[in-house]
Amino acid sequence: MFKHIIARTPARSLVDGLTSSHLGKPDYAKALEQHNAYIRALQTCDVDITLLPPDERFPDSVFVEDPVLCTSRCAIITRPGAESRRGETEIIEETVQRFYPGKVERIEAPGTVEAGDIMMVGDHFYIGESARTNAEGARQMIAILEKHGLSGSVVRLEKVLHLKTGLAYLEHNNLLAAGEFVSKPEFQDFNIIEIPEEESYAANCIWVNERVIMPAGYPRTREKIARLGYRVIEVDTSEYRKIDGGVSCMSLRF
């Protein structure tokens, strides 16, 4: 069960966030409205929420998942692969230290890691080697996890930006998977819920204390999740999709 959530209000500079999509620029007013709805959804999940203020220097700073990995035993400050995002680690560290006094580790150069590439399954962490997370970063991450009695393994990505672009672990051995992840041997022991290609964006969901928060507008995925017995909460994240963001990106859950 999660007790705490850290999130950050989007900055107006969000409209200049990094993107590989061709969906246009986000509308800030809509993005703010969508973020407010996301926070309201989290408020129904029996968690304490720390909402940090916007920081205009960092357009992508609403995506708090990437600069930190929160585990049950330590927090790890990452080193984002996107240079424009590296300062995001500095503006969140004080908050992280408050929750993990004396238990904060960090990834050092030349390693790069963005925690959107990391999926937690119990005490094991799957780490995507991607354009943003390199082999050295993954090596350091696994060494830190093992130091704290946890474990990690590497999954090589072929097409998507981050590991969790196409995967979501919903506890109880249930794994949402889209695209390249459906057939990866690393995941064949899970109960794989295959997300159809046309709804692949919906593979990025979050489990929060027996609720599943997912992007709105993907009825087939919603039905598959609901059939497993979860309470499903839909939130519109269409403005964040324009800058390669999804449901998991906007919070730290621990």
Swiss-Prot record:
Stored Pfam families: DDAH_eukar
Q: Please report the name of this protein according to its UniProt entry.
A: N(G),N(G)-dimethylarginine dimethylaminohydrolase
Q: Which reaction does it catalyse?
A: N(omega),N(omega)-dimethyl-L-arginine + H2O = dimethylamine + L-citrulline; N(omega)-methyl-L-arginine + H2O = L-citrulline + methylamine
Summary of subunit composition and partner proteins: Homodimer.
Residues annotated as binding substrate: L18, D60, E65, D66, R85, R132, I243
Q: Does the keyword Magnesium apply?
A: no
Task: Give GO BP annotations, semicolon-separated.
Answer: arginine metabolic process; citrulline metabolic process; positive regulation of nitric oxide biosynthetic process
